[in-house]
Amino acid sequence: MSLIDRDLKVIWHPYTQMQTAMPPIPIVRGEGSCVYDENGKKYIDGVSSWWVNIHGHAHPYIAKKVAEQLTKLEHVIFAGFTHEGAVELAERLLAILPANQKKAFYSDNGSTAIEVGIKMCLQYWHNQGKTRTKMLAFKNAYHGDTFGAMAVSGRSAFTAAFDSLLFEVEFIDLPTAENISDLKSQISNLKSELACFIFEPLVQGTAGMLMYEAKYLNELMAHCRENNVLMIADEIFTGFGRTGKRFACEYVTEVPDIMCFSKGLTGGTMALGITTCTQAIFDAFLSDDRLKTLFHGHSFTANPVACAAALASMDLFLEDATLENIKRIEAMHQQFALKIQHHPKIKTKRQTGTILAMEWETGNNTSYFSSLRDTLYKYFLAAGIILRPLGNIIYILPPYCITNDELNYIYGKIEQALEEI
């Protein structure tokens, strides 16, 4: 029995309609920006395997550090115990975040990092005896698939079956010059009810790589600060260089109260989540009353092996060569965007840092379930490229180690698709 047959017999894949989806492709190894299937075919990973891989697949330095950790300590309970990797990772991450970030709370992935942030905000007010339970979020947001994360995400196919069960959220448009005054008024009118404002800084990933200007986010954040509304920056996707800076929040002068990280945190090696917060939020949980404890944790909280992977990734991320690669990819994206911007099939194009998105002209058919999505996905797979269009939106989000030749190959195949499809 083939690996595909064995898979289809026992596996339920994510975001996949198992009755109609094409069979999965068995991958046996990865190297650099590429993965290889069981027949030896190479695929350039143009989406960093769901936006997680930043240094390349099977990176020898990360693999070495993970292997070393496995022979020392694979796991230890994190309630009442600690270990070097967790402490060092928290120290090093906090050192490169906004200065107001003082504490790190570990969890298992991006969704759980968001859950922790939501709980911190809600209980912050609860511990002070204040009833502020409403959340503020952007329309079309995506923050994860656990229930709290779904609640603060825009209502869509991802949440449709559960909408009646999700807690109340006030959704607002992305800020622009035209609507910023109205958005600020909405916040002022709700300030006594709002627990927090959660946002994806500069880029809404799953919504279709929707991008907005830092100056209007900064103005919105300043207004939240004036109205004592806590802020959660979801840097799960945008963090670790994706937007051209180390973190997207570096584009604004205002600082969030809470920040959430995952995806690139371990270089894409394994799952790990971190939620950081200010001293003021941490202090709101200090009490002789044990009911004011943050009652949240995971079996694999601060797993030493995942921390080792994250520390190794941090070493690589802070190297000058990584920043140079980010700038190189950014410049190449800009050149390609200019080249295709007037093509009749390109409705819009947008780019921030290493993220390049192009909206294919499809008239009114812009659904996430657009048939064009499957056509393009299969077209690029046949060419040895992994691109997963979001409906009619093609985006490129490669590992930072991708070569110029590999990027140019992707660009060339997109141009070819524009002529053939």
Predicted regions and their residues:
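Conserved N-terminal phosphate-binding loop of PLP-dependent enzymes in the Aspartate aminotransferase
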Residues: 1-421
